[in-house]
Protein backbone atom coordinates (compact mmCIF):
# COMPACT_ATOMS: atom_id res chain seq x y z
CA UNK A 1 0.00 0.00 0.00
CA UNK A 2 2.76 2.31 0.93
CA UNK A 3 4.50 1.80 -2.43
CA UNK A 4 1.23 2.32 -4.33
CA UNK A 5 0.63 5.60 -2.51
CA UNK A 6 4.15 6.74 -3.33
CA UNK A 7 3.66 5.89 -7.01
CA UNK A 8 0.35 7.78 -7.14
CA UNK A 9 1.93 10.78 -5.40
CA UNK A 10 4.81 10.85 -7.89
CA UNK A 11 2.39 10.62 -10.81
CA UNK A 12 0.35 13.48 -9.37
CA UNK A 13 3.46 15.61 -8.98
CA UNK A 14 4.51 14.83 -12.58
CA UNK A 15 1.04 15.71 -13.91
CA UNK A 16 1.05 18.97 -11.93
CA UNK A 17 4.51 19.86 -13.21
CA UNK A 18 3.55 18.98 -16.79
CA UNK A 19 0.40 21.09 -16.52
CA UNK A 20 2.35 24.02 -15.13
CA UNK A 21 4.92 23.66 -17.91
CA UNK A 22 2.21 23.54 -20.58
CA UNK A 23 0.52 26.61 -19.08
CA UNK A 24 3.82 28.50 -19.02
CA UNK A 25 4.59 27.57 -22.63
CA UNK A 26 1.08 28.55 -23.71
CA UNK A 27 1.21 31.92 -21.96
CA UNK A 28 4.67 32.63 -23.35
CA UNK A 29 3.57 31.77 -26.88
CA UNK A 30 0.45 33.90 -26.55
CA UNK A 31 2.54 36.81 -25.32
CA UNK A 32 4.92 36.50 -28.26
CA UNK A 33 2.02 36.32 -30.70
CA UNK A 34 0.28 39.36 -29.22
CA UNK A 35 3.53 41.33 -29.27
CA UNK A 36 4.06 40.40 -32.92
CA UNK A 37 0.65 41.55 -34.12
CA UNK A 38 0.34 44.63 -31.90
CA UNK A 39 1.56 47.90 -33.60
CA UNK A 40 4.69 49.39 -32.14
CA UNK A 41 3.81 52.05 -29.58
CA UNK A 42 6.04 54.67 -31.17
CA UNK A 43 4.57 54.06 -34.62
CA UNK A 44 1.04 54.29 -33.26
CA UNK A 45 1.89 57.50 -31.42
CA UNK A 46 3.45 59.00 -34.56
CA UNK A 47 0.37 58.13 -36.58
CA UNK A 48 -1.88 59.69 -33.96
CA UNK A 49 0.24 62.85 -33.94
CA UNK A 50 0.10 63.03 -37.74
CA UNK A 51 -3.68 62.63 -37.75
CA UNK A 52 -4.01 65.32 -35.08
CA UNK A 53 -1.81 67.66 -37.16
CA UNK A 54 -3.91 67.03 -40.27
CA UNK A 55 -7.12 67.67 -38.34
CA UNK A 56 -5.71 70.93 -36.98
CA UNK A 57 -4.78 71.92 -40.52
CA UNK A 58 -8.29 71.13 -41.74
CA UNK A 59 -9.80 73.29 -39.00
CA UNK A 60 -7.56 76.21 -40.01
CA UNK A 61 -8.26 75.62 -43.70
CA UNK A 62 -12.02 75.68 -43.11
CA UNK A 63 -11.69 79.12 -41.50
CA UNK A 64 -9.25 80.88 -43.83
CA UNK A 65 -9.01 79.04 -47.16
CA UNK A 66 -12.28 77.33 -47.95
CA UNK A 67 -13.93 80.41 -49.50
CA UNK A 68 -11.44 80.60 -52.37
CA UNK A 69 -10.15 77.03 -52.62
CA UNK A 70 -13.31 75.03 -51.93
CA UNK A 71 -14.42 72.53 -49.31
CA UNK A 72 -12.47 69.71 -50.96
CA UNK A 73 -9.48 71.77 -52.15
CA UNK A 74 -10.92 71.63 -55.67
CA UNK A 75 -10.70 75.40 -56.18
CA UNK A 76 -13.40 77.98 -56.86
CA UNK A 77 -13.79 79.61 -60.26
CA UNK A 78 -12.53 83.23 -60.40
CA UNK A 79 -11.38 82.97 -56.76
CA UNK A 80 -8.67 80.43 -56.25
CA UNK A 81 -7.04 77.39 -57.92
CA UNK A 82 -7.29 73.76 -56.88
CA UNK A 83 -4.85 72.73 -54.16
CA UNK A 84 -5.04 69.02 -54.90
CA UNK A 85 -1.51 67.81 -55.59
CA UNK A 86 0.31 71.06 -54.78
CA UNK A 87 1.90 69.48 -51.70
CA UNK A 88 3.11 70.83 -48.39
CA UNK A 89 6.03 72.67 -50.01
CA UNK A 90 3.93 75.12 -52.02
CA UNK A 91 1.58 75.58 -49.06
CA UNK A 92 4.48 76.39 -46.75
CA UNK A 93 5.84 78.98 -49.18
CA UNK A 94 2.52 80.78 -49.68
CA UNK A 95 1.35 80.77 -46.05
CA UNK A 96 4.69 81.28 -44.31
CA UNK A 97 5.56 84.25 -46.53
CA UNK A 98 2.17 85.84 -45.80
CA UNK A 99 1.09 85.75 -49.44
CA UNK A 100 -1.85 83.59 -48.43
CA UNK A 101 -4.49 84.32 -47.39
CA UNK A 102 -4.57 87.25 -49.84
CA UNK A 103 -5.94 90.61 -48.72
CA UNK A 104 -7.58 91.14 -52.12
CA UNK A 105 -7.43 89.81 -55.67
CA UNK A 106 -4.63 91.50 -57.57
CA UNK A 107 -2.04 90.78 -60.25
CA UNK A 108 0.35 89.26 -57.74
CA UNK A 109 0.17 88.30 -54.07
CA UNK A 110 2.58 90.43 -52.04
CA UNK A 111 4.74 89.28 -49.18
CA UNK A 112 3.39 90.45 -45.82
CA UNK A 113 3.44 89.53 -42.15
CA UNK A 114 2.12 85.95 -41.97
CA UNK A 115 -1.24 85.39 -40.30
CA UNK A 116 -0.30 82.00 -38.93
CA UNK A 117 2.53 80.74 -36.74
CA UNK A 118 5.11 78.21 -37.88
CA UNK A 119 3.21 75.37 -36.21
CA UNK A 120 -0.11 76.41 -37.77
CA UNK A 121 1.53 76.74 -41.18
CA UNK A 122 2.88 73.19 -40.91
CA UNK A 123 -0.58 71.95 -39.92
CA UNK A 124 -2.21 73.52 -42.99
CA UNK A 125 0.60 72.14 -45.15
CA UNK A 126 0.08 68.64 -43.71
CA UNK A 127 -3.65 68.82 -44.48
CA UNK A 128 -3.06 69.89 -48.08
CA UNK A 129 -0.45 67.18 -48.64
CA UNK A 130 -2.78 64.56 -47.16
CA UNK A 131 -5.20 65.37 -49.99
CA UNK A 132 -3.35 64.64 -53.21
CA UNK A 133 0.30 64.64 -52.21
CA UNK A 134 2.81 66.81 -54.08
CA UNK A 135 6.25 68.34 -53.40
CA UNK A 136 7.03 68.15 -49.70
CA UNK A 137 8.71 70.37 -47.15
CA UNK A 138 12.37 69.45 -46.60
CA UNK A 139 13.03 68.25 -43.05
CA UNK A 140 16.22 67.60 -41.11
CA UNK A 141 16.92 64.16 -39.66
CA UNK A 142 15.65 65.33 -36.26
CA UNK A 143 12.26 66.22 -37.76
CA UNK A 144 12.74 70.00 -37.78
CA UNK A 145 12.13 72.09 -40.90
CA UNK A 146 15.40 72.38 -42.83
CA UNK A 147 16.87 75.89 -42.89
CA UNK A 148 20.64 76.31 -42.56
CA UNK A 149 21.23 72.79 -43.88
CA UNK A 150 19.91 74.07 -47.24
CA UNK A 151 22.75 76.59 -47.49
CA UNK A 152 24.78 74.65 -50.02
CA UNK A 153 25.33 71.01 -50.92
CA UNK A 154 28.40 70.89 -48.65
CA UNK A 155 27.13 73.04 -45.79
CA UNK A 156 28.76 72.20 -42.47
CA UNK A 157 29.00 74.84 -39.74
CA UNK A 158 29.16 77.47 -42.47
CA UNK A 159 28.66 78.12 -46.17
CA UNK A 160 31.26 76.47 -48.41
CA UNK A 161 32.80 79.02 -50.84
CA UNK A 162 32.76 76.36 -53.57
CA UNK A 163 28.98 76.09 -53.17
CA UNK A 164 28.69 79.87 -53.47
CA UNK A 165 30.72 79.83 -56.68
CA UNK A 166 28.55 77.13 -58.24
CA UNK A 167 25.39 78.82 -56.97
CA UNK A 168 26.49 82.13 -58.47
CA UNK A 169 26.78 80.58 -61.94
CA UNK A 170 23.43 78.81 -61.60
CA UNK A 171 21.72 81.94 -60.29
CA UNK A 172 23.07 84.04 -63.16
CA UNK A 173 21.83 81.52 -65.73
CA UNK A 174 18.39 80.80 -64.24
CA UNK A 175 17.34 83.62 -61.91
CA UNK A 176 19.19 86.89 -62.54
CA UNK A 177 17.09 87.90 -65.54
CA UNK A 178 14.15 88.51 -63.20
CA UNK A 179 15.59 88.84 -59.70
CA UNK A 180 18.69 90.89 -60.59
CA UNK A 181 22.13 89.39 -60.10
CA UNK A 182 22.12 90.13 -56.35
CA UNK A 183 18.50 89.13 -55.67
CA UNK A 184 17.12 92.68 -55.56
CA UNK A 185 14.13 91.80 -57.72
CA UNK A 186 12.76 93.66 -60.72
CA UNK A 187 9.67 94.71 -62.66
CA UNK A 188 7.80 92.34 -64.97
CA UNK A 189 4.83 92.89 -67.28
CA UNK A 190 1.16 93.53 -66.40
CA UNK A 191 1.84 94.94 -62.95
CA UNK A 192 3.83 91.92 -61.84
CA UNK A 193 7.34 91.83 -60.42
CA UNK A 194 10.09 89.53 -59.20
CA UNK A 195 10.37 90.07 -55.43
CA UNK A 196 13.43 90.92 -53.38
CA UNK A 197 14.89 87.70 -51.97
CA UNK A 198 16.30 89.05 -48.70
CA UNK A 199 13.23 88.36 -46.49
CA UNK A 200 12.81 84.78 -47.74
CA UNK A 201 14.22 82.02 -45.57
CA UNK A 202 16.04 79.01 -46.97
CA UNK A 203 12.98 76.74 -47.04
CA UNK A 204 10.91 79.37 -48.86
CA UNK A 205 13.57 79.82 -51.55
CA UNK A 206 13.91 76.06 -52.01
CA UNK A 207 10.16 75.57 -52.32
CA UNK A 208 9.84 78.53 -54.70
CA UNK A 209 12.32 76.89 -57.06
CA UNK A 210 10.63 73.50 -56.71
CA UNK A 211 7.00 74.60 -57.07
CA UNK A 212 7.16 77.79 -59.17
CA UNK A 213 4.70 80.10 -57.39
CA UNK A 214 2.77 82.74 -59.37
CA UNK A 215 4.95 84.02 -62.24
CA UNK A 216 8.02 81.97 -61.41
CA UNK A 217 8.90 78.91 -63.51
CA UNK A 218 9.20 75.51 -61.84
CA UNK A 219 12.64 73.95 -61.55
CA UNK A 220 12.15 70.22 -61.08
CA UNK A 221 14.99 68.05 -59.82
CA UNK A 222 15.71 67.19 -63.46
CA UNK A 223 16.30 70.85 -64.30
CA UNK A 224 18.04 71.79 -61.07
CA UNK A 225 19.05 68.97 -58.73
CA UNK A 226 18.52 69.26 -54.98
CA UNK A 227 22.22 70.06 -54.51
CA UNK A 228 22.10 72.74 -57.21
CA UNK A 229 19.11 74.35 -55.52
CA UNK A 230 21.06 74.36 -52.25
CA UNK A 231 24.04 75.99 -53.98
CA UNK A 232 21.78 78.76 -55.32
CA UNK A 233 20.52 79.33 -51.77
CA UNK A 234 24.14 79.48 -50.58
CA UNK A 235 24.82 82.24 -53.12
CA UNK A 236 21.67 84.22 -52.24
CA UNK A 237 22.39 84.13 -48.52
CA UNK A 238 26.05 84.91 -49.06
CA UNK A 239 25.18 87.92 -51.24
CA UNK A 240 22.80 89.17 -48.57
CA UNK A 241 25.13 88.70 -45.60
CA UNK A 242 28.45 89.75 -47.17
CA UNK A 243 29.19 93.47 -46.60
CA UNK A 244 29.72 95.56 -49.73
CA UNK A 245 33.45 96.01 -50.30
CA UNK A 246 32.89 99.35 -52.00
CA UNK A 247 30.89 100.96 -49.20
CA UNK A 248 27.28 101.99 -49.83
CA UNK A 249 25.87 99.51 -52.34
CA UNK A 250 23.10 101.84 -53.61
CA UNK A 251 20.46 99.19 -53.08
CA UNK A 252 22.47 96.48 -54.82
CA UNK A 253 20.69 97.17 -58.11
CA UNK A 254 23.90 97.24 -60.11
CA UNK A 255 24.90 99.55 -62.98
CA UNK A 256 21.50 101.30 -63.23
CA UNK A 257 21.65 103.01 -59.85
CA UNK A 258 25.41 103.34 -59.98
CA UNK A 259 25.29 105.01 -63.40
CA UNK A 260 22.45 107.31 -62.33
CA UNK A 261 24.30 108.31 -59.18
CA UNK A 262 27.46 109.04 -61.16
CA UNK A 263 25.48 111.08 -63.68
CA UNK A 264 23.66 113.13 -61.02
CA UNK A 265 26.80 113.74 -58.99
CA UNK A 266 28.77 114.54 -62.14
CA UNK A 267 26.15 117.04 -63.39
CA UNK A 268 25.99 118.75 -60.00
CA UNK A 269 29.78 119.02 -59.88
CA UNK A 270 29.98 120.35 -63.45
CA UNK A 271 27.22 122.93 -62.87
CA UNK A 272 28.85 124.01 -59.62
CA UNK A 273 32.22 124.30 -61.35
CA UNK A 274 30.69 126.32 -64.23
CA UNK A 275 28.98 128.69 -61.78
CA UNK A 276 32.19 129.11 -59.83
CA UNK A 277 34.16 129.86 -62.99
CA UNK A 278 31.47 132.33 -64.11
CA UNK A 279 31.52 134.14 -60.79
CA UNK A 280 35.30 134.47 -60.97
CA UNK A 281 35.14 136.10 -64.39
From Swiss-Prot:
It is a multi-pass membrane protein. Binds 2 heme c groups covalently per subunit. Heme c 1 binds at residues 65, 68-69. InterPro entries: bc1_cytC-su (IPR009152), Cyt_c-like_dom (IPR009056), Cyt_c-like_dom_sf (IPR036909), Cytochrome_c_Oxidase_Subunit (IPR050597). The keyword Nucleotidyltransferase does not apply. It is found in: Cell membrane. The cytochrome bc1 complex is composed of a cytochrome b (QcrB), the Rieske iron-sulfur protein (QcrA) and a diheme cytochrome c (QcrC) subunit. The bc1 complex forms a supercomplex with cytochrome c oxidase (cytochrome aa3). This is Cytochrome bc1 complex cytochrome c subunit. It comes from Corynebacterium diphtheriae (strain ATCC 700971 / NCTC 13129 / Biotype gravis).
Amino acid sequence: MTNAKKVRARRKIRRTAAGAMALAVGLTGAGILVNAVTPDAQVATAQQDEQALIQEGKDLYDVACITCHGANLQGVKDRGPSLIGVGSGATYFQVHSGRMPMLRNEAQAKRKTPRYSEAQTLAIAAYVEANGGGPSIVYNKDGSVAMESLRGANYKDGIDPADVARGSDLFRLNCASCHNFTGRGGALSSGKYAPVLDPANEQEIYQAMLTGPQNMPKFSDRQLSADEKKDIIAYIKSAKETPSQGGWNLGGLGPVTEGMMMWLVGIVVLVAAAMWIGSRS
